[in-house]
Amino acid sequence: ILMGVGEKRRELPSEFRGELLPNIRAAEPFCRGCLVLEGESFENDADLAKKVAADPRFAEWQMIVLHDRIEYARSAEKFLWATWTRFDPARDIFSAETKLERNHISYSGPCVIDARMKPWYPAEVEPHPDTVKLVDRRWQEYFPK
């Protein structure tokens, strides 16, 4: 997804300048060509990713990831974790056009991943602040260089 080979085909956008759809609160690029959208919860708009994929104002973006929080666009660690642990490839990938070519699915951009929390997912587990402080304080003891 983030690799290209061969001759350059297009300029990848680095900024979103359009008007947002209803139920989309924010848009920020994660990297050139990959836009993160903060959208309404899955419970309140289950078809939002499908709407984004079909909307022409997002046509210049090759990859769009729909999240619950825009902050995931601001950190590679958060983006990768929140994206790849919160979508099911069989049900959460949408595109402007989908074709079957030689028994392979072919997506035409934008390709939208719905990485919002779903009602059937377990709740996020957050560490207790005291535990975080203890581990941070003793990290070198646990894992000396």
Where are these regions (language model features)?
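Charged, compositionally biased interaction regions
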Residues: 1-145
